Amino acid sequence: MNSDLNKLQPYPFERLAALKAGIAAPEHFNAINLAIGEPKHVPPHFIAEELLAHLHGLANYPTTKGSLALRCAIRDWLLMRFKLPANSLDPEQHILPVNGTREALFAFAQCVINRGQPALVLMPNPFYQIYEGAALLAGAEPYFLNTTEATQGLPDFDTVPEAVWQQCQLLYLCSPGNPTGAVIDADTLQKLIRYAEQYDFIIASDECYSEIYFDESNPPMGLLEAAAHAGNTDFKRCIVFHSLSKRSNLPGMRSGFVAGDAEIISAFLQYRTYQGCSMAPYTQAASIKAWGDELHVQENRRLYQQKFTAVVDILSATMDVRLPDASFYLWPKTPVDDAVFTRELFAQYNVNVLPGSYLSRDAHGVNPGHQHIRIALVAPIEECIEAAHRICKLNEQFKK
């Protein structure tokens, strides 16, 4: 058995289940689940039609590389969304479809980490737990970059010691962030690209929340966009991960892509020829339609905007909470230990949220998730509003 498996910590939702074990939630309150970031808005109507229309593809093995039509659709979306130079992306060299970004983010570390020398993988803290597991099982050590109120919910890259950069082989970014919703600006991204060149590491930017934002005239900056603005139109050392799960409310379809540096994409394709699972032909067909349509994405943003406006207005009366730059999470402070608050919210009010400390690690003398909860505004607006009122009631109880 791989001894590195012993380094993995229980997944946050496993810990949440243990926290609630043996507790019977009050039945006079309807259950409201805001713990998991699973979109609940209605998927685009045309997706089911495309899936059904292409079921004949079940008779064929799909290629690891995916169809040229899908890669072209992804190319067109990237050019449009991030205003990239027209000829900067070749669908044959720069793009690789994947079955959702979860497995791709994990597999990527296995592909690029050189086990022959000491390796650090830098990542935000709190963080999407796949980053840590990927680093550990690739034989590397995670190095956590705390995101706190003092750093506006972003990693403070200026405090990273020179010796850490020298051992860095991979930097995971998450922008917009999970759970803070903070967006990394162009200057910072371009500085990190320079660091990647100077210290010889790869940047893996998880941008799965990039299409959930509030200002239609100011969408979040992407890594490839920042690279192109800096003249790095070959996207050297830059890889981005995108998904239809959040953008198009299709978490069950498992469709995303990896794009960027052609040399790295070529190596990742070779790796995935052995390890990865090819995307089903009917999923590819539906994905082409999804990447080609923006109307449903705009409607998605409108629905989240409504929920954020209503919920932040309610919670701000009793909690320290702010509207994030983007994503569908709130990250408020709690008056007591976050696990205690989460347990009592379920026990007394039948509302599920996630303790912030379950998403973070003790690092540099603090746990940045302590006394925070992550609220995923994925439920219908009526449930989100009701949950906000219940959260306020519990908050007031603890403040007495």
What are these regions (language model features)?
Residues L34, L58-Y61, A73-D76:
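Glycine-rich loop-to-alpha-helix module at the N-terminal edge of alpha/beta enzyme cores
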